Each structure stands twice: as C-alpha cells, then as structure tokens.
C-alpha cells in the first residue's frame, strides 16, 4: 500500500496529475525530501500520509516559506544534498525532478541506503536518456542522463531492492520555438543552456529556424523522459553472488 501511494505521490509533481482521494492513511515516522522546490511533492505527501518528523532539503532557503501542517516537526537542510550530513535512521526518502542534477548519483544512493532503517524506502522521479532530445540535438547542451537500465544497476549496487520502476515518454506541444524556451525557463527542472541571456540575436534566430524540424500538425515538440522508482532497504543484507 505504501509503495502504490508513494508512486502516485511522486507522479503528481512530475506529470501534473491531481492528488487522488485517500481512503486509508499511512504513517511515516521520519522522512527526508530531497529538492523540495515549490513544495508540490510535499503537498501531495500530506494528502496521503501522516508524518511525525520531516526533513526538507533544497539549495535555497525560500522553501521555509512553503506551507506545512501546523503539527509537523519540520527540519530544514539547506545546501547541496551531496555535501550536507543526512539525518540518521530515516524511514523514507523521497524526491521529484531533482536527482538529475546529481551525476553520477552512486555516492548519494549509497548515503541514502546507509541512513535508512531496514525496510525503509527510497521513492523518486527523475529523468533518463532521451530527455529534452530536441534541445540537445540543436544546442549540444544538456545534463548527462542514464538509461533506465543504468539507473537500475546503480540502485542495485547501492544495496536497494527495486519495488517499482517505470520509464515513460511525454511529448509536449508548443505554438513556437520561443514558447519552448519560455517553458524551459519557467520549469527549471533541467539545465540545457537555453537561458535567453546566453543567446545573441543571431543565435536565437538560428535556433528558432532549426527548431522547424520538430514542427508537427500539433505544434513544436518537446520530449520528456521521466522515470519513477520505488526501492527499499532489505531487512537483511543481500548476499553477494558467488
């Protein structure tokens, strides 16, 4: 039940799905969210779970203005998740549209594994190879992405057992190449070097001209490759293969 609910909670932020109605509450004692941002995943969390102690991480301290339930014990961990100390004995770690900034993620995965209690879960959405393929094709810029298989191997090597693992492809359509750039600036979920400050008048015109190859009857395409996973720390250490 926890696995199914957490998949849906992470999916809420990634796809714009509305939080679903809760029938049975689940309780989590100690939980960490990596990359809180505007708090969409946090909101979905409290629609479906009760939490005693919540640790909220982000690079920026403005997350402290996000609305939270009055009775929650909230603790803010401001800074690079790869550099700061993680809380101990967590029951769960969640993240949405943030892990792609950490590459390779092996060290973080191992740290998350170590801080979880036996049976604790790690649930997240991120992006995989092929994400924003149109932008990378035109600019040669973008974040490095794993294939789904590579990401699964990293989780297994950190010690996790995989419960849910699903890659998807979502194609958005826009009225113009400039609308694509405005969307990327507004979302800020991935670095592609498309900030307008980086463009000259000539390079921007060339980009818009070259983007014509991605025009369809429905509009100009922009492809996302999100991936959702839920994994857990085994109750007993996994035996190494002979």
What is each stretch, according to the model?
Residues 144-159:
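Short alpha-helix
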Residues 1-23:
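Class I SAM-dependent methyltransferase Rossmann-like catalytic core
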Residues 91-105, 126:
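A short SAM/SAH-binding and catalytic strip from SAM-dependent methyltransferases
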Residues 32-84:
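Class I SAM-dependent methyltransferase SAM/SAH-binding core
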Residues 121-148:
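Conserved class I S-adenosyl-L-methionine
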